């Protein structure tokens, strides 16, 4: 199974992630978010995506919870309230299909510390591919990858031709996380 954890995003991925970060920032400002990650995700596939699962290392979702679905070509948002010590650290998995109708999954993980420092920066980690890859997730492995992740990243699974790109930035009292779930074709 071939896959690529890429260092640089395509222009389209960067544009999409920047738009989602801006949406998250606007939402965070509107609700006066504190010590949280405001997450905005866009579905750039050709079918609706459904929420499969989440994992919280620190903090929890607030408000209406995780979006149950993300219709094609639309975005959805949620707020993950951090705890006072470690901030917001969590992950979500959404299921959908690739261009061939094969079941696929997209994973987004983020770390938005309470106090961002050079040694404790905001981070994201992403993964995608065949749905079976996400049947049993080692959350310890995901956390280890997140702990060394960058502030922006993207991933392409060449077997399923799926992609995911994400970025996180500090916005005063909260972090804005943007992600684009897509196809490489």
Swiss-Prot record:
InterPro entries in the cross-refs: Jasmonate-induced_protein, Nakanori
Pfam families from the UniProt entry: Nakanori (PF21230)
PANTHER family in UniProt: JASMONATE-INDUCED PROTEIN HOMOLOG (PTHR36482:SF6), OSJNBA0024J22.15 PROTEIN (PTHR36482)
Homology family: Belongs to the jasmonate-induced protein family.
Protein name, per record: Jasmonate-induced protein homolog
Organism: Atriplex canescens
């Amino acid at each position: 199974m071939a896959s690529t954890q890429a260092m640089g995003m395509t222009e389209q991925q960067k544009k999409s992630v920047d738009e989602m970060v801006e949406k998250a920032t606007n939402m965070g400002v509107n609700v006066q978010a504190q010590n949280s990650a405001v997450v905005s995700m866009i579905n750039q596939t050709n079918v609706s995506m459904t929420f499969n699962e989440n994992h919280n290392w620190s903090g929890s979702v607030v408000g209406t919870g995780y979006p149950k679905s993300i219709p094609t070509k639309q975005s959805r948002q949620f707020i993950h309230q951090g705890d006072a010590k470690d901030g917001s650290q969590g992950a979500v998995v959404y299921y959908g299909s690739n261009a061939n109708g094969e079941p696929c999954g997209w994973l987004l993980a983020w770390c938005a510390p309470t106090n961002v420092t050079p040694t404790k920066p905001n981070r994201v980690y992403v993964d995608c591919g065949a749905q079976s890859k996400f049947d049993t997730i080692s959350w310890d492995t995901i956390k280890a990858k997140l702990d060394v992740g960058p502030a922006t990243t993207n991933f392409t699974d060449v077997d399923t031709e799926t992609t995911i790109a994400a970025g996180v930035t500090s916005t005063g009292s909260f972090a804005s996380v943007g992600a684009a779930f897509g196809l490489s074709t």
